[in-house]
Curated annotation (Swiss-Prot):
GO cellular component terms listed in the entry, alphabetical order: chloroplast; ribonucleoprotein complex; ribosome
Name of the protein described by the UniProt record: Large ribosomal subunit protein bL36c
Domain of life: Eukaryota
Classification of source organism: Eukaryota, Viridiplantae, Streptophyta, Coleochaetophyceae, Coleochaetales
GO biological process: translation
Organism for this UniProt entry: Chaetosphaeridium globosum
UniProt KW Ribonucleoprotein keyword: yes
Length: 37
């Protein structure tokens, strides 16, 4: 899980979602997991 100031999609499988007021990226590739914070 990468914690970044700005999250972006890395590939076409990445999905931007909001959980508990946090913007997160979920993907089938675990390296692409990110959250904003």
């Amino acid at each position: 899980m990468k914690v970044q100031a700005s999250v972006r999609k890395i590939c076409e499988n990445c999905r931007l979602i909001r959980r508990r007021r946090r913007v997160m990226v979920v993907c089938k590739n675990p390296k692409h997991k990110q959250r904003q914070g």
